[in-house]
């Protein structure tokens, strides 16, 4: 038995033990009393009680101890029976116990130093540490932010958290305004800034998904992401075509990864291979240049991954193979744009280094045209996989620098494969995902049945305002009901007029759907797992210590993307480089 349990038992039974010891003296008084009749003995006992209590110590006579035992046990039994049969009252909570959280409720979850926190509202914050002094206060850093258009998702929540500068950040930037307003602040706080711009490719760093392919598993992940986010509207139907496309793309990408020079491992080469894959419907024996490449590969490496996948694709007849090629060509049509080919020619983002040093990666996308948003989804998919693998293989389970993904307009970037599993596992690797939506129904539309799993792994949920019915209904139910007092009056008029008043208790939603729909524009609702909800003011960006470094404060702080991308890299003391002799490299 542990010391804690022993103390608990002692505290529970000590009163009954003390009563039993005192009762031994009454037992002694009864034993010393004279008389044969009960009344005589009771009268005599009045004179023996002072004698029995003359000695403050309990009597150890067997009969006296028996009296004490019976008294102590009898009282314990009476207390037990009363408690067992007692009516269960919850005064003031008959119809619900919901209430708003207070400063005392959030205090255990906040770090003393302001910069070591995630900003949730004006008065509530969440410590970045995954190991608080009391383990029961540990919460993951995933956040779900829901707010209609104009509710301040970017100004009141995303920007203040970006300016905290305690982690590496991956920021989805619709319209490209966040990097302009906060980029200079990140540079002045020692960050390396990187930009992927799918609106203006000329103002973007290069991103090549092939640069992060290191194994057959990575090839399959890349193909899955590409297939998931490039299927057009109403592309349902026979899954045969999609599976056939997957086989062909897997074979070609695997060939490029294992057989082609590094400079040819990109989407431009992949498209060139597809363009040379002519199929003659009336000549099954015809071999195009790609067929010849794989035939040569089969001779050198009979069991290669690329060869096996291509062999399965070649089982299709000529007409079927032609249809598969047309489908693949349509899927990769965006890469026919020369600017996009140039963008994906090589890689500058270095996604696998975000957990090594403080970096701010801005992913600029259009909020009106989703043509190139699949690139953003590919970045996130590869980012999560790369960082999780690096945390496990290099850093013993967690990254030295926490990586926060602030995914604004989450519904517009497409589907991130296996997001429901990722949000449940990235916490231990020092990675967090913050999803910003206009309505919860957006998440349901993209992730279907997995949407609830994703929401369930968000320990912090913030509602900034909105009028979407599903969101309001779910939120009102989650807030629960409180018990209120109702005052009714009755006035009966007639031959015998009467007037009466009644008081009663009833349940009422903490905030009903209509009340949520007209929530004050300066207010927000925070729900932190295991804590009462908070009705608080939104955080005021102008009060942030780093606000003066933004272009909101001074237009001179506007970040010039073009100038930054064209800068010359400076060499600093302590920088490490790998020197390679160009003459020793194998020729292409």
Describe every region a protein language model picked out:
Residues 1-151, 155-158, 202, 481, ...:
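Basic- and hydrophobic-enriched, low-structure N-terminal and domain-boundary segments
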Residues 21-24, 28, 134-431, 446, ...:
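P-loop NTPase motor domains
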Residues 423-525:
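Conserved ATP-driven motor cores of ASCE-family P-loop NTPases powering translocation/secretion/packaging/pilus
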């Amino acid at each position: 038995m542990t010391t804690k349990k022993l103390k608990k038992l002692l505290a529970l039974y000590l009163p009954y033990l003390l009563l039993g010891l005192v009762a031994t003296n009454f037992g002694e008084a009864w034993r010393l009393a004279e008389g044969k009749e009960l009344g005589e003995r009771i009268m005599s006992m009045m004179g023996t009680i002072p004698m029995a209590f003359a000695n403050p110590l309990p009597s150890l006579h067997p009969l006296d101890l028996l009296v004490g035992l019976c008294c102590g046990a009898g009282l314990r039994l009476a207390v037990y029976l009363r408690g067992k049969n007692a009516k269960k009252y919850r005064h003031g909570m008959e119809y619900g116990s919901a209430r708003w959280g207070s400063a005392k409720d959030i205090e255990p979850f906040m770090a003393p130093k302001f910069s070591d926190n995630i900003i949730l509202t004006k008065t509530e914050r969440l410590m970045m540490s995954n190991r608080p002094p009391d383990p029961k206060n540990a919460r993951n850093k995933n956040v779900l932010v829901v707010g209609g258009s104009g509710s301040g998702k970017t100004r009141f929540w995303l920007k203040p958290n970006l300016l905290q500068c305690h982690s590496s950040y991956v920021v989805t930037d619709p319209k490209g305004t966040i990097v302009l307003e906060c980029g200079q602040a990140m540079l002045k706080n020692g960050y390396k800034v990187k930009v992927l711009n799918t609106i203006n490719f000329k103002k973007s760093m290069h991103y090549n998904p092939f640069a992060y392919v290191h194994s057959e598993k990575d090839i399959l992940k890349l193909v899955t992401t590409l297939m998931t986010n490039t299927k057009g509207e109403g592309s349902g139907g026979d899954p045969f075509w999609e599976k056939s496309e997957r086989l062909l793309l897997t074979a070609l990408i695997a060939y490029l990864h294992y057989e082609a020079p590094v400079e040819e491992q990109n989407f431009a080469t992949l498209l060139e291979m597809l363009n040379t894959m002519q199929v003659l419907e009336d000549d099954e024996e015809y071999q195009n240049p790609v067929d010849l490449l794989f035939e040569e590969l089969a001779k050198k490496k009979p069991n290669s991954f690329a060869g096996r996948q291509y062999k399965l694709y070649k089982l299709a007849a000529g007409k079927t193979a032609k249809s598969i090629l047309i489908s693949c060509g349509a899927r990769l049509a965006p890469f026919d744009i020369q600017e996009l080919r140039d963008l994906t020619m090589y890689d500058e983002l270095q996604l696998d280094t975000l957990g090594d040093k403080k970096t701010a990666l801005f992913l600029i996308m259009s909020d009106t045209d989703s043509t190139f948003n699949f690139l953003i989804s590919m970045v996130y998919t590869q980012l999560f996989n790369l960082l999780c693998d690096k945390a496990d293989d290099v850093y013993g389970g967690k990254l030295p620098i926490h990586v926060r993904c602030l995914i604004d307009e989450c519904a517009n970037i497409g589907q991130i494969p296996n997001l429901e599993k990722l949000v449940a596992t990235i916490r231990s690797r020092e990675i967090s995902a913050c999803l910003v939506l206009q309505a919860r129904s957006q998440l349901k539309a993209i992730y279907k049945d997995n949407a609830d799993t994703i929401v369930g792994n968000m320990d912090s949920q913030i509602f900034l305002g909105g009028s979407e019915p599903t969101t309001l209904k779910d939120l009102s139910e989650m807030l629960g009901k409180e018990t209120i007092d109702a005052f009714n009056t009755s006035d009966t008029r007639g031959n015998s007029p009467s007037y009466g008043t009644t008081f009663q208790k009833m349940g009422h939603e903490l905030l009903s759907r209509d009340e949520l729909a007209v929530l004050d524009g300066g207010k927000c609702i925070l729900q932190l797992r295991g804590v009462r909800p908070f009705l608080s003011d939104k955080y005021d960006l102008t009060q942030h210590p780093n606000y003066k470094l933004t272009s909101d404060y001074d237009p001179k702080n506007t970040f010039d993307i073009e100038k930054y991308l064209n800068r010359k890299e400076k060499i600093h003391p302590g920088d490490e480089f790998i020197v390679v002799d160009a003459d020793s490299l194998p020729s292409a």
